[in-house]
UniProtKB/Swiss-Prot annotation:
GO biological process: cell division; cell wall organization; peptidoglycan biosynthetic process; regulation of cell shape; UDP-N-acetylgalactosamine biosynthetic process
Single GO term (MF): UDP-N-acetylglucosamine 1-carboxyvinyltransferase activity
Primary localization: cytoplasm
UniProt catalytic activity: phosphoenolpyruvate + UDP-N-acetyl-alpha-D-glucosamine = UDP-N-acetyl-3-O-(1-carboxyvinyl)-alpha-D-glucosamine + phosphate
Name of the protein: UDP-N-acetylglucosamine 1-carboxyvinyltransferase
Active site positions: 115 (proton donor)
Organism the protein comes from: Shigella dysenteriae serotype 1 (strain Sd197)
Subcellular compartments: Cytoplasm
Stored CDD domains: UdpNAET
Cross-referenced InterPro entries: Enolpyruvate_Tfrase_dom, Enolpyruvate_Tfrase_sf, MurA_subfamily, RNA3'P_cycl/enolpyr_Trfase_a/b, UDP_GlcNAc_COvinyl_MurA
Binding sites annotated in the UniProt record for UDP-N-acetyl-alpha-D-glucosamine: 91, 120-124, 160-163, 305, 327
Keywords: Cell cycle, Cell division, Cell shape, Cell wall biogenesis/degradation, Cytoplasm, Peptidoglycan synthesis, Pyruvate, Transferase
Annotated Gene3D superfamilies: Enolpyruvate transferase domain
Length: 419
């Protein structure tokens, strides 16, 4: 397995161009199965999960090409089963199920894999499809969905806020007969982006970005060209990297209005932040950040995917900060690894109490999930000496060319090929 070797400490300075959002690109790629004409999707990041999704769409019979943009022609889809060998590495493949059953009346997806963060059941996807009239069976490790004729619009109240299930229900409802209302819907920018993509193809959707989404079913969806929004988590990760290194950075191709909660906390930590239409600058003026208290919750609150990065910020900040995780259990696996680098933290149920230290020391650490592993790489950027981060395949699932982007900001980082 590949590793990163990072020599620190470095003060990050310069510009970084933000990639398209993985968490919008994936649902949009699967939503392309609904289209009866070719679609072009721009600003799709080059990531392992994206490659896996494109491979999966090809196996279903879609024509998929990448030349800058991703081109998908799903007219000839004739296989309705997403097999285990592709699904096992990636939870997002569950998003193939709704479009398949909505357009073709049948679909089956192997139960998914992905990051090992807490319980992420597919129950909410299943109950949403059942409420739209699909028959669901769980057999031999597969979720099998079918419907006679079209799905039927329904008034669906989500038991809990779920980005994944909101995507499944919204995509499926675009081709259902009648109107679907989703109450307690997820409000994430990636949901809005997926809805806007579907609207480009001819879907009738309103209320995306609120907790009540209304979808009027249409007979068919056509083609179109759509640009994926910038990755707010990648943006936030680079902003934190600059903040903890007391540096100065400009993020280009960013979307500031998707990061309100994160930018507010960075300002609390002492960062001087300016924003334009598609850029964000951060300058620490050489100062050490101040500890901040953070509580994760569904959008528009503070995102769970930025929790590990802010845990690290607090561990090198002035003072003591509390980080409370309310979205996923089992999401503090980076904390013991950071302790090996000299960090002082205590975990009490779903809260980490961070006591800031002046500096970290390089160490050998291991990545456990996508965002935790990013925080270990950032720790290596500011630690004294050499840090080796093992199991970085987690990072490759969510960050495009992170080492090249860090190098351009002055970091001494190299990828060491594994056995």
């Amino acid at each position: 397995m590949d590793k990163f070797r990072v020599q620190g400490p470095t003060k990050l300075q310069g510009e970084v161009t933000i990639s398209g959002a993985k968490n919008a690109a994936l649902p949009i790629l699967f939503a392309a199965l609904l289209a009866e004409e070719p679609v072009e999707i721009q600003n799709v990041p080059k990531l392992k999960d994206v490659d896996t999704s494109m491979k999966l769409l090809s196996q279903l019979g879609a024509k998929v090409e990448r030349n800058g943009s991703v081109h998908i022609d799903a007219r000839d889809v004739n296989v309705f089963c997403a097999p285990y060998d592709l699904v096992k590495t990636m939870r997002a493949s569950i998003w193939a199920l709704g479009p398949l059953v909505a357009r073709f009346g049948q679909g089956q997806v192997s139960l998914p894999g992905g990051c090992t963060i807490g319980a992420r059941p597919v129950d909410l996807h299943i109950s949403g499809l059942e409420q739209l009239g699909a028959t669901i069976k769980l057999e031999e490790g597969y979720v099998k969905a079918s419907v006679d004729g079209r799905l039927k619009g329904a008034h669906i109240v989500m038991d809990k806020v779920s980005v994944g299930a909101t995507v499944t229900i919204m995509c499926s409802a675009t081709l259902a007969e009648g109107t679907t209302i989703i109450e307690n819907a997820a409000r994430e920018p990636e949901i809005v982006d997926t809805a806007n993509f579907l609207i480009t193809l001819g879907a009738k959707i309103s209320g995306q970005g609120t907790d009540r989404i209304v979808i009027e079913g249409v007979e068919r969806l056509g083609g179109g060209v759509y640009r994926v929004l910038p990755d707010r988590i990648e943006t936030g990760t680079f902003l934190v990297a600059a903040a903890i290194s007391r540096g100065k950075i400009i993020c280009r191709n960013a979307q500031p209005d998707t990061l309100d909660a994160v930018l507010a906390k960075l300002r609390d930590a002492g960062a001087d932040i300016e924003v334009g239409e598609d850029w964000i600058s951060l300058d620490m003026h050489g100062k050490r950040p101040k500890a901040v208290n953070v509580r994760t919750a569904p959008h528009p609150a503070f995102p769970t995917d930025m929790q590990a990065q802010f845990t690290l910020l607090n561990l090198v900040a002035e003072g003591t900060g509390f980080i409370t995780e309310t979205v996923f259990e089992n999401r503090f696996m980076h904390v013991p690894e950071l302790s090996r680098m000299g960090a002082h933290a205590e975990i009490e149920s779903n809260t980490v109490i961070c006591h800031g230290v002046e500096k970290l020391s390089g160490a050998q650490v291991m990545a456990t999930d996508l965002r935790a592993s990013a925080s270990l790489v950032l720790a290596g950027c500011i630690a004294e000496g050499t840090t080796v981060v093992d199991r970085i395949y987690h990072i490759d699932r969510g960050y495009e060319r992170i080492e090249d982007k860090l190098r351009a900001l002055g970091v001494n980082i190299e990828r060491v090929k594994g056995e």
